[in-house]
Design a protein with these regions (language model features):
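Active-site-surrounding "flap" and adjacent substrate/cofactor-binding loops of secreted or lumenal enzymes
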Residues: 95-115
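An alpha-helical repeat/solenoid feature that recognizes helix-turn-helix modules
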Residues: 23-52, 70-96, 115-156, 163-207, ...
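Short amphipathic alpha-helical "recognition" segments used for binding
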Residues: 6-9, 132
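N-terminal secretory signal peptides that target proteins for export/translocation
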Residues: 1-4
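Buried hydrophobic core positions in alpha-solenoid tandem helical repeats
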Residues: 57, 61, 65, 105-109, ...
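Bacterial N-terminal signal peptides
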Residues: 8-18
C-alpha cells in the first residue's frame, strides 16, 4: 500500500512537472498569447517594415494588453498598466480604448480595496495602485471628460498607501518600471494631475504637498529626471521655469546622431534599482555605444512635445524620422530588456510611447 502511495505521488509530481514545462514552453514561443491572439517573441533581428504602419502598431498594443490581461490576470506595469495610462489619450485618433481592460482595472480596484492595508503597502502593490489610478484618470480625461467614482476611489486608495516621505513604494529589481520609488511617485503625480478637477479640489492638501517636496528635492538619475519633466507638463507650478528648461536640455543632450535615444544612456548600470542588473548590462556587446530604442525615443519625443518643444524643431524631426524608419514587421519597435534576454516586455511600452509621440506630431489621423 505504501509503495502504491509513493508511486501515485511520483506520477502526480511528474504530471504537474510536464504541465508546468508545457506552459513555460508555450510562453517561450510567444511574447503574448491567449486564445487566437499569438504575438511572436521580440527580437533585435526582426525585419523592419518598409513603411510605417499605424494599424500594425495599434494591433500589437491592443492584442498584447488583452492577451496579458486574459492569461496572466494581473496588473503589470509593463503591459496592461502601460495600456491603461497610454491608450486613452489616443481616443481622438484611434477611437475608444478597450472596455474589457478598464473593467479589469475596476475589478482590480475592488480586490485592492479588500486587501489588508499593510499588505497593500508592501512590494510592488503601491505602484500597481498608482498605475490603476492613473489609468482610470486618463480614461476620465480623454474618454468621458469627467471624474468617475471609480477614479476618485482609486486616488483615495493611492493616498492611503503613500509612504511617510511622500513617495510610493516599489520593488527595486525590474527597471525601468519596477525599480524605484521615484518612478512610481511620478506615476502617482500624473494620476493626480490628470484626473479632471481632482487636484484643484484638494487645495493645500498635506499628502499632495509631501509628494511635491519628494519630487522636487529628490536626486534621481536622468531617466527619473525625464519622468519629472513629464509630470511638470501637466502640473503647472511644480517646477520653476529654468529648472524645467534645464530638464529639456538634459533630454536633448542625450539624443544620438541617428535622431533616437537609448534608455541605457539615462542611468549607469548600478543606478537601475539596487544595481542588480549591472553585471548583465555591462556584459552587453553594445554597452559602450548602446543603440537608439523605441521605448526611449518614443518617451523622449512625447515628453519634449508636451513640454512645449515644437514638432518642427529639427531635433524632433530627426526623432520622428527615426521612429518612422525603425518599426518592425510585427508592428512594434525593438527595445532590449534591461533585465533578462527572454521576453523583452519593454517592447510594449516601446510601442505605446512611439504611437503617443507620433500622435503629438500630427502623424496619426483623427477618426
Amino acid at each position: 500500500m505504501e509503495r502504491k502511495r509513493h508511486v501515485g505521488v511520483w506520477i502526480l509530481v511528474l504530471t504537474l512537472g510536464t504541465v508546468i514545462a508545457q506552459d513555460q514552453d508555450l510562453h517561450l514561443k510567444h511574447q503574448y498569447h491567449s486564445g487566437e491572439i499569438s504575438i511572436p517573441p521580440a527580437s533585435e533581428s526582426e525585419p523592419f517594415l518598409r513603411k510605417f504602419s499605424p494599424a500594425l502598431a495599434v494591433a500589437y498594443m491592443e492584442e498584447g494588453a488583452t492577451a496579458w490581461t486574459r492569461e496572466r490576470k494581473c496588473l503589470s506595469c509593463h503591459t496592461n498598466g502601460t495600456y491603461l495610462v497610454a491608450r486613452p489619450s489616443l481616443t481622438r485618433s484611434l477611437g475608444r480604448p478597450s472596455e474589457e481592460i478598464r473593467n479589469f482595472a475596476v475589478q482590480q480596484l475592488k480586490e485592492f480595496r479588500s486587501t489588508d492595508l499593510e499588505k497593500l503597502r508592501s512590494g510592488i502593490r503601491p505602484t500597481q495602485v498608482a498605475y490603476l489610478a492613473q489609468g482610470l484618470a486618463e480614461w476620465d480625461a480623454h474618454v468621458t471628460g469627467k471624474l468617475s467614482p471609480e477614479t476618485e476611489d482609486a486616488l483615495g486608495l493611492m493616498l492611503e498607501v503613500q509612504g511617510e516621505s511622500g513617495d510610493w513604494g516599489n520593488t527595486d529589481a525590474w527597471p525601468p518600471f519596477e525599480s524605484s520609488n521615484y518612478q512610481s511617485t511620478t506615476v502617482a503625480a500624473l494620476a493626480m494631475a490628470t484626473a479632471p478637477g481632482w487636484l484643484a479640489a484638494r487645495g493645500q492638501d498635506g499628502a499632495v504637498e509631501k509628494m511635491k517636496r519628494y519630487l522636487q528635492t529628490g536626486s534621481p538619475h536622468d531617466y527619473g529626471r525625464l519622468l519629472l519633466l513629464w509630470v511638470s507638463t501637466r502640473w503647472p507650478g511644480l517646477l520653476e521655469g529654468e529648472v524645467k528648461q534645464a530638464l529639456v536640455e538634459n533630454v536633448l543632450g542625450h539624443q544620438r546622431k541617428d535622431g533616437g535615444w537609448s534608455i541605457r544612456s539615462f542611468a549607469a548600470p548600478e543606478e537601475w534599482g539596487r544595481g542588480n542588473r549591472a553585471e548583465k548590462l555591462r556584459s552587453e556587446d553594445q554597452f559602450q555605444d548602446p543603440p537608439s530604442d523605441g521605448h526611449q525615443t518614443g518617451l523622449c519625443l512625447l515628453v519634449l512635445r508636451q513640454a512645449g518643444v515644437p514638432a518642427a524643431d529639427p531635433r524632433l524631426q530627426r526623432a520622428v524620422k527615426w521612429l518612422l524608419s525603425h518599426q518592425r514587421e510585427s508592428g512594434r519597435w525593438w527595445t532590449r530588456s534591461l533585465n533578462t534576454d527572454k521576453f523583452h516586455f519593454i517592447t510594449y511600452s516601446g510601442t505605446c510611447y512611439p504611437l503617443l509621440a507620433l500622435d503629438t506630431c500630427g502623424l496619426l489621423a483623427p477618426r
